[in-house]
A protein has these predicted regions:
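Aromatic (phenylalanine/tyrosine) cluster motif
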Residues: 3-6, 27
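Intrinsic-disorder-associated, low-complexity terminal segments enriched in Asp/Asn/His/Tyr and depleted
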Residues: 3, 16-17
Length: 176
């Protein structure tokens, strides 16, 4: 018989009052910390989604840095990525007649891995946000609208997955 070990344990500390904490791989986070992380993540992701041509990919880089520097979010991404072997170049971004489109994987782990791997490529290679956005066929629209459509289409689901996870963790803390 095998058992799956979880990194997360809910513990209660008693001092003057009850403090609920989330123990995450030796890293303790209380409700206030989780709210701060959630708030900062929403701000960083909003900045990224509202990027314009003058920003290039500065906010995309800040978005990735926030994910990579935040242990709870990075552990969540890593826990999903390890169960997927999808190649984003073959199964996420498809090119047809010179234009690219997003093919959304049905499996959540595959979707998260594809988005994160694509984010890594975009930021490591310092690829032009303008150039990538213009590869998606949108008809006639303004440059900034094209960039924002591209970011929403490609990365908004990743933001939703992370936000949902943070909310689930807050609920788990409150119920303990």
């Amino acid at each position: 018989m095998s058992y799956m070990l979880f990194k997360r344990e809910i513990i209660i500390w008693r001092r003057d009052n009850i403090i609920l904490c989330l123990l995450w791989g030796g890293f303790e986070v209380n409700m206030e910390d989780l709210r701060k992380i959630s708030f900062e993540f929403r701000r960083v992701s909003s900045d990224m989604l509202n990027s314009i041509t003058d920003d290039n990919n500065v906010y995309l880089i800040k978005f990735r840095e926030f994910i990579d520097d935040n242990k709870i979010i990075k552990d969540y991404i890593d826990s999903k990525v390890k169960y997927s072997s999808i190649d984003w170049q073959k199964s996420f971004i498809e090119e047809d007649c010179g234009y690219k489109s997003v093919i959304i994987p049905q499996n959540k782990n595959d979707h998260i891995k594809a988005m994160y791997d694509y984010l890594v490529v975009m930021t490591d290679r310092n690829k032009s946000l303008n150039g990538e956005a213009f590869n998606f066929h949108l008809g006639r629209c303004k440059v900034n609208e094209r960039i924002q459509f591209y970011l929403n289409r490609v990365f908004l689901p990743l933001i939703h997955y992370i936000n949902d996870y943070l909310i689930e963790e807050m609920i788990a803390l409150q119920e303990s």
